[in-house]
Amino acid sequence: MSSKSSKRKKITAAQRKEVLNDFRTALESRQASIMGRREVLTGKAKFGIFGDGKEVPQLAMAKFFREGDWRSGYYRDQTFMLASGIMTLENFFAQLYGDTDLSANPDNGGRMMNNHFATRSLDEEGKWKDLMKQKNVSADISPTAGQMPRSLGLALASKVYRQEKDLHSLKQFTSKGDEVCFATIGDASTSEGHFFETLNAAAVLKVPLAVSVWDDGYGISVPIEHQTAKSSISEALKGFEKGKNDHTGIRIFKAKAWDYEGLMETYRKGVEVCRKEHIPVLFHITEVTQPQGHSTSGSHERYKPKERLEWEKEFDCILKMKQWILKGGIASEEELSDIEQKAVQRVKEARRNAWNNFQKPILRKRDDFIKKVNISTCRCLKVDKIDKLLQELARIGEPTRRDIISTGKKILRLICNTCTPQESTLKKIVTKWLNDEFADNQLRYSSHLYSQSKQSPFKIKEVPVVYENDAPMVNGREILVANYDHIFSKYPEALIFGEDVGHIGGVNQTLEGMQKKYGDLRISDTGIREATIIGQGLGMAMRGLRPIAEIQYFDYLLYGLQVVSDDLATLHYRTAGGQKAPLIISTRGHRLEGIWHSGSPLSMVINSIRGVHVLVPRNMTQAAGFYNTMMLSDDPALIIEPLNGYRLKEKMPANIGEFTVPLGKPEVMTEGTDVTLVTYGSCVRIAQDAVEQLRGFNVSVELIDVQTLLPFDLEHVIVKSLEKTNKIVFFDEDVPGGATAFMMQKVLEEQGGYRYLDAEPATVTAKDHRAAYSTDGDYFSNPNAEDVFEKIYSMMNEYNPGAYPVIF
């Protein structure tokens, strides 16, 4: 397994100082891993995953990471964070303890487990900071390889900034595109499709993406021969390698994890090529060790053979670095021993400081609560039980907020109701204290799912659509063409990409002529690669651009759903408001033809991407209004255009590109008095047909288009209708128990609509199976106007059989 190190040269005093500083950083990082594991095993922390064994290669990578650059990595990169000066040892332990104080844990405010890193791109008001004055780290996620799609967008932004001269003025985001995205990944995770899809796209697009693969030979317990072709990712990727006459491809570099000098030279060469020439590079770092195993969940001694464990001790990168220092006469054994001892003490100090800072506010909170209860003038009948609870709370040496809240709730249950409000000071005290604590903890753990800035879509002024008297009737797609033209003219940072988006102007011609007018960088075609289309948009949005990522059909969003769910939807939340990605995902869906061109799986989406707004316009005018709203907002959104509406006639608005449609505001399409019918998207036209049919049978239906599912009816329009009609039907093309069940829960439970019901609420949905092919297949798979008619008429028959006799 060993390999000869590169030839050594004499070093200067400055270089000596740098080497010893690197050695100190590596030692401190290793000790942080060791002590961090101990904190978990002794119960102070919940879980630990560390970067031991990867210290030396990360020192090298950090040398060439500069202000304005971006990292898109994973949970092994603590040494890189320390060496880059982005994280302190106190930050490391604060993260391990789950400290919610952003000054101590700026990465995520206690919302993610340890070693999940992020820098803060936004100020306290949610505005962009100057990202060129800091080293940037995009927020990590646990799903391995999940960082790869995002890295494509972070790198592609540099290409856009370099080539689009109109964007050179955006100096808080770029220095003419010289920024590199550094991605890191473990060797086992290179087996994920995200990895290959990202590398392929990066090679095709020619972007400055520098990928480091930490190859320690295992994916938890599974050895590399079961993971990777040829047991080597660099060998497996030979076909990607850029030859002398190749137009596209990647450069591949290999180095040993313990070869300090060789690693420095390898990263110097690779990053220089990547930065200057915008060629993706892969650093395959081999012979990596993992001294403590995968995580605190278990020991690697269970699955690694004795020979491997012995080799890992011999080729530990820090030990090898020490031997190299001694052999080169850079420092003496005594000097290195002193550095080692000081590293241990420094990490112990950081651990102690972080723990004290974490515990102090909780201890103060506990003592304050006990004091408040004890000074109460109220003496309840169950005072002995209350005193016992307080004593138990006081005895907890390292309390959590949960301990205090739980005690408060139990005490509240014991307070008697025999006292008058004037006498029962204890109940007032405990109730107010609990309410205040819930409000505080809402901010600690539940804030920033969506934007709270002035650019929140809920703060965007509604601008109604305006029509001239002689407004022409046009195909719906033409409204989108005109609206896109306005967007790309108004916002130089706006761009759109997807399959068939560029050259032919989209499969439904909604971007006709846009590439010719705005260029193939802003209006661009992509390969068939939905996961990285989403990642491409996500990364660019994090760097100040305004991307629109088109997924050709809603059915194919599933390929990219993991990226939306785990990364995009959680970004603002998991950084406690520190990062944002105002990406618009554009797609088209609902009924058309066949299993995979008629999908409307809204329940799958709305239940997996909370944090992304889900907008379901009934026509292209409403869709255009949503695009305009979201371009003014800093939240991400999924806009699902009705697939069968591009050739339907609509009036051309006079204020195209300017009108907006508010989020969470249903529209009453038809007023009625008997039944409330709630739907969205393509189902609106079907519902309108059913309403007309029912009118002929003396049934008055109030038809409501919800317009957006996330958010849903913020003004309680639907429950106000239900208060009038006392009967309600929810209608869509999702599966039974899908989005109709979601809407029902919102209206009946959350809005309290159950109290107005005079009849059992009903749903009209598609079948459990996918929609069959052909007109008849659609008719017998998806709900139609006749189904809606029958459901509502049956409801009226049950309510008043004399007025509405059985007709079926």
Can you annotate each of these PLM segments?
Residues 1-46, 75, 449-461, 791:
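Cofactor-/ligand-binding subdomain signature composed of acidic, glycine-rich
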Residues 31-212, 217-219, 223-247, 595-597, ...:
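Cofactor-binding active-site loop characterized by glycine-rich and histidine/acidic residues
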Residues 55, 59, 136-408, 643-808, ...:
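Thiamine diphosphate
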Residues 60-61, 82-87, 193-197, 215, ...:
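Short acidic, glycine/serine/threonine-rich loops at helix termini
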Residues 74-75, 145, 151, 184-185, ...:
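Short beta-strand segments
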Residues 383-543, 555:
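Non-catalytic terminal/interface segments that mediate subunit docking, oligomerization
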Residues 579, 589-593, 597, 602, ...:
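Active-site phosphate/pyrophosphate-binding segments
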